Amino acid sequence: YCQKWMWTCDSKRKCCEDMVCQLWCKKRL
């Protein structure tokens, strides 16, 4: 289970299932 404020973007969690978090993750990095 994942929430917007929980997004970790790990290659193992694939950014919280189907949520579009890749873009957000890239920004964070």
From Swiss-Prot:
GO terms for molecular function: potassium channel regulator activity; sodium channel regulator activity; toxin activity. Inhibits voltage-gated sodium channels Nav1.1/SCN1A (IC(50)=630 nM), Nav1.2/SCN2A (IC(50)=230 nM), Nav1.3/SCN3A (IC(50)=770 nM), Nav1.4/SCN4A (IC(50)=1290 nM), Nav1.6/SCN8A (IC(50)=630 nM), Nav1.7/SCN9A (IC(50)=15.3-1000 nM) and potassium channels Kv11.1/KCNH2 (IC(50)=4.2 uM). It comes from Grammostola rosea (Chilean rose tarantula). The presence of a 'disulfide through disulfide knot' structurally defines this protein as a knottin. It is found in: Secreted. Expressed by the venom gland. Belongs to the neurotoxin 30 (phrixotoxin) family. Keywords: Disulfide bond, Ion channel impairing toxin, Knottin, Neurotoxin, Potassium channel impairing toxin, Secreted, Toxin, Voltage-gated potassium channel impairing toxin, Voltage-gated sodium channel impairing toxin. SUPFAM superfamilies: omega toxin-like. Changing residue 22 to K: 111-fold increase in inhibitory potency on human Nav1.7/SCN9A. This is Beta-theraphotoxin-Gr1a. One of its GO terms (cellular component) is extracellular region. The keyword Transmembrane does not apply. Disulfide bonds join 2-16, 9-21, 15-25. Negative results: does not inhibit sodium channels Nav1.5/SCN5A (IC(50)=22 uM) and potassium channels Kv11.2/KCNH6, Kv11.3/KCNH7, Kv1.1/KCNA1 and Kv1.4/KCNA4 (IC(50)>200 uM).
